[in-house]
Amino acid sequence: MLNRFAAVLVVCGAWFFAALPAVAQPQAIQYFPVGPIYEYRWKLLELALAHAPAKTADEPTRLVPYADDVTQNRGMHLLQTGGIDVIALGTNAEREAKMLPIKIDILRGIVGFRVFVIRAFDQARIAGMDEQALRKELTFGLNSQWADLPIMRANGFTVETSSSYENLFGMLVAKRFDAFPRGLNEAGRELGERRLAYPQLAVERTKALYFPYPVYFWVNKDNTALAQRIERGLTAALADGSFRKLFETYHATEIALLAKEKRQVIRLKNPILPAGTVAPDTHWWWR
């Protein structure tokens, strides 16, 4: 009898809790791109969201990397269709037409300062080149989906492409091209992660390119609430100095190295910048 009574209680209890309205859990904010070289971008977004707390209980606060390995173009498509919430990429007119940028440069122009990953035995050859020789004698490697590809070509450089970022390192070793331009904040870190796979590669010591290239957070055009929240948070982090502190923490090595180096900096035009784009403020790390 007791067993039957207990069973009735279990059934009734299950029915009672099933009948209760489900409590909606805040959805996560999915971001792209993902990987070690992008860590700073997402720490900055985390900082911005902390400076602009959610106004409602169901507003997303938790950041989650997009799980699938997709190309940059695919990532932008997913943002436009609701599969991804935030991306962090450089700007151009096409992107600004399709997505909603938060127009605060999150990398302060440092991505536009490009040094070259090269085969180590080419150090002396490239060091002896002037600007004209760089254009005439070198072939550069870039991802076919990166926004800096048309910048390089518009400035007279010969470029070999691949849709795979990782394949570009192997192509450089195989002499498919001569130099892989990488952001000042990217080159050393990327080679450090691949020193066992590609010990024959090095960062070139004497040359650099610079073009204005702001990097923004982007959201779906309809997601104005998230855009406003990110902008509010970034503005607050700029005001209290925490934005700059985070930037300098992540880029301290590169900033110190640049201060000591005597590189020939070749300034390039950026024809893909939308009209009215504010030039990056580089004084945190350069001049």
Regions found by a protein language model. Name each.
Residues A6-A19:
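Bacterial N-terminal signal peptides
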Residues P65-D85, A154, E166-E186:
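Short helices/loops that flank or line small-molecule/ion binding pockets
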Residues Y40-L44, D222-G233, S242, L246:
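Short amphipathic alpha-helical coupling segments at ligand-binding clamshell hinges
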Residues N143-A154, L234-R287:
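Ligand-binding clefts/hinges and TM-proximal coupling segments of bilobed small-molecule sensing domains
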Residues A24-K98, I230:
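Extracytoplasmic small-molecule ligand-binding "clamshell" domains
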